[in-house]
Protein backbone atom coordinates (compact mmCIF):
# COMPACT_ATOMS: atom_id res chain seq x y z
CA UNK A 1 0.00 0.00 0.00
CA UNK A 2 1.33 3.44 -0.92
CA UNK A 3 2.18 5.71 1.99
CA UNK A 4 0.84 9.25 2.18
CA UNK A 5 3.38 11.78 0.96
CA UNK A 6 4.92 13.54 3.95
CA UNK A 7 6.94 16.12 2.04
CA UNK A 8 6.96 17.84 -1.34
CA UNK A 9 10.17 18.43 -3.31
CA UNK A 10 10.88 21.21 -5.78
CA UNK A 11 14.00 22.36 -7.62
CA UNK A 12 14.45 26.02 -8.48
CA UNK A 13 17.11 27.79 -10.52
CA UNK A 14 18.11 31.42 -11.05
CA UNK A 15 21.35 32.70 -12.63
CA UNK A 16 23.94 30.17 -11.39
CA UNK A 17 22.06 29.21 -8.19
CA UNK A 18 20.29 25.88 -7.70
CA UNK A 19 17.88 25.36 -4.79
CA UNK A 20 16.46 22.03 -3.63
CA UNK A 21 13.32 22.77 -1.61
CA UNK A 22 11.36 20.48 0.74
CA UNK A 23 7.90 21.51 1.94
CA UNK A 24 6.84 19.67 5.08
CA UNK A 25 3.13 19.99 5.98
CA UNK A 26 2.25 21.13 9.49
CA UNK A 27 5.45 22.99 10.28
CA UNK A 28 6.42 26.63 10.18
CA UNK A 29 9.45 28.70 9.23
CA UNK A 30 12.08 28.64 6.51
CA UNK A 31 15.47 26.99 7.02
CA UNK A 32 18.19 27.57 4.42
CA UNK A 33 21.35 25.42 4.54
CA UNK A 34 20.66 24.69 8.22
CA UNK A 35 20.20 28.34 9.23
CA UNK A 36 17.10 30.47 9.83
CA UNK A 37 16.20 32.58 6.79
CA UNK A 38 16.87 35.96 8.46
CA UNK A 39 20.24 34.73 9.69
CA UNK A 40 21.17 33.30 6.27
CA UNK A 41 20.35 36.50 4.35
CA UNK A 42 21.94 38.70 7.03
CA UNK A 43 18.76 40.60 7.83
CA UNK A 44 18.05 41.72 4.25
CA UNK A 45 14.25 41.72 4.49
CA UNK A 46 13.68 42.08 0.74
CA UNK A 47 15.33 38.69 0.10
CA UNK A 48 13.19 37.08 2.81
CA UNK A 49 10.07 38.54 1.19
CA UNK A 50 11.13 37.20 -2.24
CA UNK A 51 11.42 33.69 -0.76
CA UNK A 52 7.99 33.93 0.93
CA UNK A 53 6.12 35.34 -2.09
CA UNK A 54 4.65 32.04 -3.37
CA UNK A 55 3.57 31.03 0.15
CA UNK A 56 2.01 34.45 0.80
CA UNK A 57 0.20 34.44 -2.56
CA UNK A 58 -1.34 31.02 -1.93
CA UNK A 59 -2.01 31.78 1.78
CA UNK A 60 0.01 28.74 2.91
CA UNK A 61 2.66 30.65 4.89
CA UNK A 62 1.96 28.87 8.20
CA UNK A 63 0.96 25.49 6.73
CA UNK A 64 4.41 24.29 5.63
CA UNK A 65 7.91 24.14 7.06
CA UNK A 66 10.37 24.94 4.29
CA UNK A 67 13.81 23.33 4.28
CA UNK A 68 16.19 24.43 1.55
CA UNK A 69 19.61 23.36 0.29
CA UNK A 70 20.95 26.04 -2.06
CA UNK A 71 24.32 26.29 -3.84
CA UNK A 72 25.97 28.70 -6.28
CA UNK A 73 25.58 32.37 -7.09
CA UNK A 74 24.97 35.28 -4.74
CA UNK A 75 22.22 36.19 -2.32
CA UNK A 76 19.79 37.60 -4.87
CA UNK A 77 20.16 34.67 -7.27
CA UNK A 78 19.75 32.22 -4.40
CA UNK A 79 16.57 33.97 -3.21
CA UNK A 80 15.14 33.75 -6.75
CA UNK A 81 16.08 30.08 -7.01
CA UNK A 82 14.40 29.32 -3.67
CA UNK A 83 11.25 31.15 -4.78
CA UNK A 84 11.17 29.07 -7.98
CA UNK A 85 11.65 25.84 -6.00
CA UNK A 86 8.97 26.72 -3.42
CA UNK A 87 6.48 27.45 -6.21
CA UNK A 88 7.20 24.09 -7.89
CA UNK A 89 6.87 22.23 -4.58
CA UNK A 90 3.56 23.99 -3.83
CA UNK A 91 2.30 22.79 -7.20
CA UNK A 92 2.93 19.18 -6.14
CA UNK A 93 1.17 19.83 -2.83
CA UNK A 94 -1.93 21.36 -4.43
CA UNK A 95 -2.53 21.30 -8.21
CA UNK A 96 -5.28 23.96 -7.92
CA UNK A 97 -2.65 26.64 -7.13
CA UNK A 98 -1.15 26.35 -10.64
CA UNK A 99 -3.15 29.19 -12.19
CA UNK A 100 -2.31 31.71 -9.44
CA UNK A 101 1.39 30.77 -9.39
CA UNK A 102 1.63 30.84 -13.20
CA UNK A 103 -0.08 34.26 -13.37
CA UNK A 104 2.34 35.70 -10.79
CA UNK A 105 5.27 34.30 -12.81
CA UNK A 106 6.66 32.08 -10.05
CA UNK A 107 6.70 28.91 -12.18
CA UNK A 108 8.72 30.49 -15.00
CA UNK A 109 12.50 29.95 -14.93
CA UNK A 110 14.14 33.39 -15.29
CA UNK A 111 16.49 32.67 -18.21
CA UNK A 112 18.60 35.85 -17.86
CA UNK A 113 22.27 35.03 -17.35
CA UNK A 114 25.43 37.15 -17.16
CA UNK A 115 26.73 37.97 -20.63
CA UNK A 116 30.27 36.72 -21.21
CA UNK A 117 33.24 39.04 -21.61
CA UNK A 118 34.51 39.28 -25.20
CA UNK A 119 38.16 39.65 -26.22
CA UNK A 120 39.14 43.15 -27.33
CA UNK A 121 36.62 44.61 -24.86
CA UNK A 122 36.98 45.65 -21.22
CA UNK A 123 33.72 43.95 -20.17
CA UNK A 124 30.91 42.24 -22.08
CA UNK A 125 30.11 45.36 -24.13
CA UNK A 126 32.34 48.15 -22.84
CA UNK A 127 35.01 49.05 -25.41
CA UNK A 128 38.40 50.57 -24.62
CA UNK A 129 38.40 54.36 -24.73
CA UNK A 130 38.73 55.69 -28.28
CA UNK A 131 41.33 58.37 -29.01
CA UNK A 132 41.41 60.25 -32.31
CA UNK A 133 45.02 61.38 -31.79
Curated annotation (Swiss-Prot):
GO terms for cellular component: cytosolic small ribosomal subunit. Keywords: Ribonucleoprotein, Ribosomal protein. SUPFAM superfamilies: Ribosomal protein S5 domain 2-like. Residues 114-133 are annotated as: Disordered. One of its GO terms (molecular function) is structural constituent of ribosome. Residues 118-133 have a biased composition (Basic residues). GO terms for biological process: translation. It holds the Pfam family Ribosomal_S9. PROSITE patterns: RIBOSOMAL_S9. NCBIfam families: PRK00132.1 (NF001099). Belongs to the universal ribosomal protein uS9 family. This is Small ribosomal subunit protein uS9.
Amino acid sequence: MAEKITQYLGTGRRKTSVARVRLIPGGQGVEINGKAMDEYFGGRAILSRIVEQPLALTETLNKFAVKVNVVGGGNSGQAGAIRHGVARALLLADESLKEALREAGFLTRDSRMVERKKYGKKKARRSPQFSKR
